Swiss-Prot record:
TM stretches of this protein: none
Origin organism lineage: Bacteria, Pseudomonadati, Pseudomonadota, Betaproteobacteria, Burkholderiales
Annotated residues for binding of L-methionine: I435, G436, S437, E488, D603
Record text on cofactor binding: Binds 1 zinc ion per subunit.
Cofactor(s) it depends on: Zn(2+)
Catalytic activity: 5-methyltetrahydropteroyltri-L-glutamate + L-homocysteine = tetrahydropteroyltri-L-glutamate + L-methionine
Pathway(s) where this gene product acts: Amino-acid biosynthesis; L-methionine biosynthesis via de novo pathway; L-methionine from L-homocysteine (MetE route): step 1/1
Record-given protein name: 5-methyltetrahydropteroyltriglutamate--homocysteine methyltransferase
Gene3D superfamilies according to UniProt: 3.20.20.210
């Protein structure tokens, strides 16, 4: 019979139990009692998740997908590969040691963190040097196998593969090539796999998502020898690829001496034919046809039609699965009491997706009639989504269709706009500002909670937030900032806030997914055509502007970031949805301008995150992403100044696209790199104004004026004074007011010092 399985289950718990247990553990100083409570929580979550898989009818439960903080870090712990600078004993690694690597300690900073491929999950970046060694590590995976077997489950273990583990790391201390470490890493994996076989594990899923990338030849060539060394003495190995089409590697993957392969049919449906053709008789093929990265209910009839001919060819060698781990999906739709029945009928969270996988397996094995109820309900939902007036708004579709190239262009080029803006605002050289948000204080959180619970009425909430705006304006005036912001006290999240106010978005109560460690995010759902029924931010910006004669920036989240940080409808191209959001934001910019707001910031921190994994797909993405931003921001007059903000660890490869946004001012995150990120501007002359961050807001440390002055002077080596702004790296939402007060006062002081030396060079 065809096997049904998933690649992984969310680890945080249906009520974010892991998040709260972790935070209690850290808050209690990693005491013995706190550690016992954390370990008990982890054990209970694993048991619940395995039972969910069993109740759904899956043929095995996935073990090894659980991690206390991050699965890449946990894999390093399994193979004794944590950074040497921490000095940990790999075999005696404690939870406190593990978290020290993730979060830093008194002696060492935390490991670097970055995005897991093109998802919104963050992994901890391995550190490799010529001295790196691997070997036996923690016993956690074997403990989990024993737990699963004791509960009567059939475990399939899951591990990040050796090639991916090396690829994801960074070379340090003169290591020329991470592949040099593969001969050291393979024996550690081989020993781990041999022990899993001894523990009674029949199958091990080895995740190698790097095959979805434009993989260099040396890495491709290393795959077969590595797996030839791994297979002897190991359980059956299922090499799992996901996140994109891997058909260019089909011959290589089919030639690997493993027992099976997994392919992602959601991100690469066309690749199926390349794998089924001449598929080896000794391998299973796991087809990931239930979307592990989105929230929409599977069209089971459509999936069955896609799988049926494959089943005829492969028989029981066809496995049914999710496209990738369900780590990226919310846990359970049953915990969404506020979503209406119509919308809920279109959705499937992780628990529901396990059932979809099993239903497809049963339909192939027993016929559709055996699971008619599940299939009929899915068919009704699919039909409703295709025709619902709630999803399809003819007015929005007409507006998108009517867009022209002129709508994506400002009336004048930057030089003319800059002259008009200088005349309007009369700012000094090196103008100072912030990125947007100020501290979300306990008072703000209490007022928001009281309002949501009905304890505080709407008028009381507005008054409480207005008081916070007044505080923010008064503080900025006391610092001496040149351009102010209202502080965003009323916003719980830079995407959810706008999603609550636009038609076509829905907000969940409990649709949390893990971002990293204990941090969870609750992405909005973009279920239909996006429309703005009324202004969203004009009241707040206008009130703030009424408190000062200095310019106050209106603050918006850009269309691409709204898209990237949401669960997006899958029934039309993402580019179309981006344009719909852009049109809504365009209306908001015009409303802000009409209300007298002369500077409007449209943030796009996720522009680079949306880059496709393969280079061949990137130009198309950047074309529509840039167009969406320009649609949002180009309707205003020449003397209205458009700002944008981006936080990247690197952006040199997309600088032409950033310039093509044609924002009057861009602010970027540069402090941690000591302005090295500005090196890209030595070969590409950015034409408009720029504010490289001079204050690292991610650290509680407060810089002094001398330190900030040094950074401003470094920036002036690359950016002309007449186009340079002075600002922090990012928003100040997570900082405390005492830190903000000291840092911004120092920033203004430093800017004034440097201003005296450049004033003569800046045109009036």
């Amino acid at each position: 019979m065809t096997t049904a399985h998933i690649l992984g289950f969310p680890r945080i718990g249906a009520q974010r139990e892991l998040k709260f247990a972790l935070e209690r553990y850290w808050r209690d100083g990693a005491s013995a009692d706190a550690e016992r409570a954390l370990v008990d929580t982890g054990r209970a979550l694993r048991a619940a998740h395995w039972q969910t898989q069993r109740d759904a009818g899956l043929d095995c439960v996935t073990v090894g997908d659980f991690a206390w903080y991050d699965h890449v870090l946990t894999t390093l712990a399994h193979v004794g590969g944590l950074p040497r600078r921490f000095g940990f004993d790999a075999r005696a690694l404690t939870l406190a040691d593990y978290f020290a690597a993730a979060r830093g300690n008194a002696a060492q900073p935390a490991m670097e963190m970055t995005k897991w491929f093109d998802t919104n999950y963050h992994y901890l970046v391995p550190e490799y040097s010529p001295a790196t060694t691997f070997g036996p590590g923690v016993e956690w995976l074997f403990d989990e196998v024993r737990e699963a077997r004791a509960l009567g489950h059939r475990p399939k273990a899951a591990l990040v593969g050796p090639l991916t583990l090396l690829w994801l790391g960074k070379a340090r201390d003169g290591l020329a090539d991470r592949l040099e470490l593969l001969p050291r890493l393979v024996p550690a994996y081989r020993a781990l796999l041999a022990r899993l076989r001894e523990a009674g594990v029949d199958w091990v899923q080895i995740d190698e998502p790097i095959f979805a990338l434009d993989l260099p030849a040396a890495w491709r060539d290393a795959a077969r020898p590595a797996y030839e060394a791994l297979v002897p003495g190991a359980p059956k190995l299922l090499v799992a690829t996901y996140f994109d089409d891997v058909s260019e590697h089909a011959a290589l993957l089919k030639a690997l001496p493993v027992a099976g392969l997994h392919v992602d049919l959601v991100r690469g449906d066309a690749q199926l034919d390349a794998f089924v053709a001449d598929y080896p008789a000794d391998k299973v093929l796991s087809c990931g046809i239930v979307d592990g990265r989105n929230v929409w209910r599977n069209d089971l009839d459509r999936s069955l039609a896609r799988l049926a001919p494959v089943h005829e060819t492969l028989g029981e060698r066809l496995w049914i699965a999710t496209s990738c781990s369900l780590l990226h999906a919310p846990v359970d739709l049953a915990h969404e009491p506020k979503l209406d029945d119509e919308l809920k009928a279109w959705l499937a969270f992780a628990v529901q997706k396990t059932r979809e996988v099993a239903a497809l397996r049963d339909a192939l094995a027993k016929g559709r009639a055996a699971v008619a109820a599940e299939f009929d309900a899915a068919a009704v939902a699919a039909a409703a989504r295709r025709t619902s007036a709630r999803i399809h708004n003819p007015l929005v579709k007409r507006r998108v269709a009517a867009l022209t190239d002129a709508d994506a262009r400002r009336a004048s080029a930057y030089p003319a706009r800059a002259a008009a803006q200088r005349a309007r605002f009369d700012l000094p050289p090196l103008p100072t500002t912030t990125i947007g948000s100020f501290p979300q204080t306990p008072e703000i959180r209490r007022a928001r909670a009281a309002f949501r619970q009905g304890v505080l009425d709407h008028l009381g909430y507005l008054e409480a937030m207005r008081e916070q705006v007044r505080i923010a304006i008064d503080k900025q005036l006391s610092y001496g900032l040149d351009v102010l912001v209202h502080g965003e006290a009323e916003r719980n999240d830079m995407v959810e806030y706008f999603g609550e106010l636009m038609w076509g978005f829905a907000i969940t109560s409990n649709g949390w997914v893990q971002s990293y460690g204990s941090r969870c995010v609750k992405p909005p759902l973009v279920y239909g055509d996006v429309y703005l029924p009324e202004p969203m931010t004009v009241g707040w910006a206008s009130y703030a502007q009424s408190l000062t004669t200095k310019p106050v920036k209106g603050m918006l989240t850009g269309p691409v970031t709204m898209l990237q940080w949401s669960f997006v409808r899958d029934d039309q191209p993402r580019a179309t949805t981006a344009l719909q959001i852009a049109l809504a934001l365009r209306q908001e910019t015009l409303d802000l301008e009409k209300a007298g707001i002369g500077m409007i910031q449209v943030d796009e921190p996720a522009l680079r995150e949306g880059l496709p994994l393969k280079a061949r797909d990137r130009a198309e993405y950047l074309d529509w992403a840039v167009r969406a931003f320009r649609i949002a921001a180009s309707g205003v007059a020449d003397d209205t100044q458009i700002h944008t903000h981006m936080c990247y660890s690197e952006f040199g490869d997309i600088l032409p696209s950033i310039a093509a946004l044609d924002a009057d001012v861009i602010s970027i995150e540069t402090t941690r790199s000591n302005m090295e990120l500005l090196d890209a501007f030595e070969t590409f002359e950015y034409p408009n104004e720029i504010g490289p961050g001079v204050y690292d807001i991610h650290s509680p440390r407060v810089p002094d004026a001398d330190e900030i002055e040094r950074l401003i002077l470094l920036a002036l080596e690359r950016i002309p004074a007449q186009r340079l702004w002075v600002n922090p790296d990012c928003g100040l939402k997570t900082r405390e007011w005492r830190q903000v007060d000291a840092a911004l006062a120092a920033m203004v002081d430093a800017a004034k010092r440097v201003r005296q030396t450049v004033e003569q060079a800046v045109p009036a």
